Amino acid sequence: VAVVAEVLQQLYDKGEFYQDEYVGFYSAKQETFLTEKDRNEDGVFDPIYGEVQELREKNYYFKLGQHQQWLIDYIDANPDFVAPDYRRNEVLGFLKNETLEDLCISRPKERLEWGIPLPFDTDYVTYVWFDALTNYLSIPRSRGEEAELWPADIHVIGKDILKFHAVYWPIMLKAADLE
């Protein structure tokens, strides 16, 4: 929790977060926001999402988009950064053909009590990807072994979480001036 709060505060102090109103659709069953892209061809959301409701709420966002070109350049200059080649090409294709949307990093505490409070606004919590990715720093730091265990030489992940590890995580590290 302490490392997550530290990284959040660092990024906030550097101006990497902003608050804005989210207007969209929310699946309570999947605990995720949905976009028009998530609708089936007939315009209906898949039953896997359960009841989907329109939602308006203020949240904090991480400015991923302003780091998009940096990440493209970094991956191009470091071809072994994402392997195998077809996964690197998948990430680069995504980055070069899509506009990277800023990442919502919070939920109002009144709606979601179990997250980690934002150190700069305790009416909000962060949860899931921001805190999960920051755990790669939390464990080595808590054991006093950060220099030995981080950064990792190789990081093996599943294909279903490629975007989080090959896009969000490196941008988070770069924005926080961490390796």
Q: What are these model-predicted stretches?
A:
Residues E16-Q68, I72:
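Cys/His-rich short segments
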Residues A2-V3, I48-Y49, L55-E179:
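Structured secondary-structure scaffolds
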Residues A2-A5, T32-K37, K96:
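Short alpha-helical interface elements
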Residues K14-Q19, N78-V82:
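Short, polar/flexible loop-turn hinges at active-site or ligand-entry regions and domain interfaces
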Residues V1-E16:
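Feature captures the FAD/FMN-dependent oxidoreductase FAD-binding
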